[in-house]
């Protein structure tokens, strides 16, 4: 998306910051970001992003626009020697976990599942072992640094010696302050997201469901 923005709007320089969904929304609130991407799962409602946007950008009208859906699941070692099959395996004391950093969508998903299953984080071997990307988690599992970790399906196809256990389809959205949508620059960004060229490029990457790409999911 960033590359397409710069190609379509040569006078605009797009800066990307990989800081996690939670921090991205906070920076949007703090006027340090123009657009935030988010995949934050609310364990109480099983909904993505909407409640977090309301809480982290209080009183600020925002528009939530879908970018894609993707599958989250467990990375496990090739052949799944520990027979890991689902969320209930988080209760097992014979497994070691590779976690993600605080503030990212994967960490919020894990912590929500622990609440849902009434599991204390202290019961998770490796809860404090953090990596900072899907790729790093998958690589750690492949190297035997842990038995499993959460990440997206697409990355599992890039790393040897791991298998992928699909668990949950997540909605990955863009969050824009509603008042900004009157700006021609933001209108052009929405045109890019809705264009066949952008969708074809995203589909070509594999692992993404584009059924709602460009659709307004909610207005807060």
For each feature predicted by the language model, list its residue ranges.
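Hydrophobic residues within well-ordered alpha-helices
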Residues: 28-29, 90, 110, 138-142
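Periplasmic-binding protein-like
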Residues: 58-71, 159-191, 193-216
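Short loop->beta-strand "edge-of-pocket" segments that line small-molecule binding or catalytic clefts
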Residues: 88-108
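A ligand-binding cleft/hinge motif common to bilobed small-molecule-binding domains
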Residues: 37-53, 138-168
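N-terminal segment of the mature folded domain
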Residues: 3-80
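Short beta-strand-to-loop elements that line the ligand-binding cleft
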Residues: 13-20, 100, 121-133
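Short helix-loop capping/hinge motifs at secondary-structure junctions, enriched
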Residues: 78-85, 179-185
